[in-house]
C-alpha cells in the first residue's frame, strides 16, 4: 500500500544515522569480509520510503555506509530520519546539517516515539507506528515544504494494518554492504518484562503480516543483494504461537525453492523449548540462531522482573533443547539488578561455563522511558541523570562495584581460548544437528569467492598479525583437518568482534549498555 499526494511531486531524503560503536553491531568483523560496511538495513525507514506516494522521489542514505553529502541535502525538499536512543547524537547532527540547507526535518522511530521531548530541534515528530500520523505528515509536506514556525507533532492513533504494509524499499539500499538482512513478521509482545519498552510502544497483542508477504519480501531481498543471513526483528517470534506455526511451512518451502541461500535467525522467549513442533519446523526452515532474553540465571531475579515465563523450563535444559534442533542460543544478560549480590559475577561465569553459550550480550541495567522499571525507579527516586555514570539506575550495590563486575565478566567471557572452546562445543552439539544443504545456489562462484576472501583475511589479520594467534590456530586446525571451512569462517567473523570489543569494554573504552547513551555523547550545538 502507498500513500496518495494528489499528483504533487516531492524529493525526500531518508537518512539513517550512524550507530555508536557497540557490542551488537559487529564493526570489528567488517574488515574480515568482502565489502561489508554495516550491520543490517533499517526496516522502519525503508518501509516509510516504500509507503511514500509514487509521485515522490526518494533517496536513501545509511550513514553507517556513507555520510549524507551537501549534494544530497541540496537535492531534497525534506529530510526523514529514524533511529533508537543510542543514535540520539547522530540524529540531532543530521537535523542540524539539514537545517543548514533550510530543509524541514521529520523524525520517527522508537526513540522519538518513547521520548519526543529529546528532540526539540526537529520540525516534525512522528510518534508511533505507520498509520494516520504518517498520512498527516505526507499531507502537510504535500501542501508546504517550508519549515514550520514551531515544532509539529503527529501521533499515530490508527495504526496501518500490517497486512497493508509495503515491501521495504530494499532497492534504495546498498544491500550487498550489510552483514545480514532484516525482516518483520509481527509487532508487539504479550509479556510485560519490567525493563522492556516493547509493550508500551507496540502493544501486547502481536499484529501480523501474512506468510505470503514474508515470502515476497524474502524474494525481494535476494533480488537486491542480501546474502548470508536474515534476522526476524520481531519482538518475540512466538508471541503468537499459532501464527509462527502458520508461517514456518511457508519458510520451509521457500528455502527448498531458493536453495537454502539464507540462514534465518530470530528473537524468542525461552519457553519455545516447550514447543518441539515449532523447533522442528524452524530446523527445517534453516533457522540457525535464536536470541533468547535469559537476562539472569537467578530465579528470584526473574520473578522480580516479571519474567516468570523463563521459569517454565529449567534454563540450562531449555538451552540444550533448543540447541538439539541445530539452533544456537544467543543470550541477553543484565547486571545491576536489585537482586544482585557481590557474588553475581561469579554466578554468571558459572552459568556461561555450564550453558556453553558463546555469545551473550552482557549489559548493565538501563531504565528506558515507558517501562514499568522507569516508573518504579522514578517513584523510588532512583533515576540518575549523570553523564559520568554507565547507567541511569541507582543500583543497590555500589555503582563502581557493578561496573567492575561487568568489566570482569566481559574480559573473562570473551577471553579467546574460553570463547573458542564454547564454539567448539556448539559445533559438536548444535551445528552438527542442523541442516547441511548442498545446493547450486550455496556453491555459487560468488559465494566461493567470498569465502576465499574471508579465509584469506582471517588467516592474515588473526592467524598471522593477530595477538591471539595461538588460540586461533588451535581452533582453526581442528576445523581445517575436518574440512569444515564454513564453520571456521562463520565462527571467526563473530568471535573476532567479541574478543576485540570485550577488550575495549574491560578497559573502560565502551558503554556498559547497548541501550544507553551518555548525555555528553547526545549533546549537539544549539541552533
Curated annotation (Swiss-Prot):
Residues 173-408 form the Radical SAM core domain. SUPFAM superfamilies: Radical SAM enzymes. This is Hopanoid C-2 methylase. InterPro entries: Cobalamin-bd, DUF4070, Elp3/MiaA/NifB-like_rSAM, HpnP-like, rSAM, rSAM_horseshoe, Tetrapyrrole_Bchl_Biosynth_MTs. It comes from the Bacteria. Binds 1 [4Fe-4S] cluster. The cluster is coordinated with 3 cysteines and an exchangeable S-adenosyl-L-methionine. Keywords: Iron, Iron-sulfur, Metal-binding, Methyltransferase, S-adenosyl-L-methionine, Transferase. Belongs to the radical SAM superfamily.
